[in-house]
Amino acid sequence: AARALKTNRTYNLGVLYEDPQHSGLGHEYFSRILESFRAQAEACGYDVTFINRNVGKRRSSYLEHCRYRGVDGVCVVCVNFLDPQVLELVQSELPVVTVDHMFNNRTSIVSDNVKGVQTLVNHVFGMGHRNIAFIHGERTAVTESRCASFYKTCYDLGLQVPDAYVREGAYHDCD
């Protein structure tokens, strides 16, 4: 408490994590990011609080919850980035870091989706495969960049990509 008074910090970081598939902390990709975030935060003397739309039994916005908890900043992971409450939080005075989504004037941690798909297709091609299919997630900016990279890499390798080879699927299915 004395340190918080002296530094004007709470040493509490918020995490906004909502997984549409309800896989919780078992999500293969985001669980690793969150564990790394938690470990680094703790190593720096911070606590981590999950942010949601409830403060006790009262509904609140994400920003209200962050203010209620007095977080020094918030990491936004795996949410609908177009949700008005997420936009309110991102546009607030709080420091915000987003994962796999970019906002102007905010820090983002993003995957190199173009290079990742390019590496994957080149690897499969190098193993002798010539009929390569691609299953992508719901239409988002991340999906668009992955699809564009898939088509471009296949084109560069001289591969034909029939429409039937590209399909939408769930990123993660709990069942």
Which residues make up each language-model segment?
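Short beta-strand-centered segments that line the small-molecule binding cleft or hinge
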Residues: R59-K115
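Short hydrophobic segments within beta-strands
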Residues: L16, I51, V77, F134-I135
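Amphipathic helical "hinge" segments at domain boundaries
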Residues: A2-Y62, D72, Y151
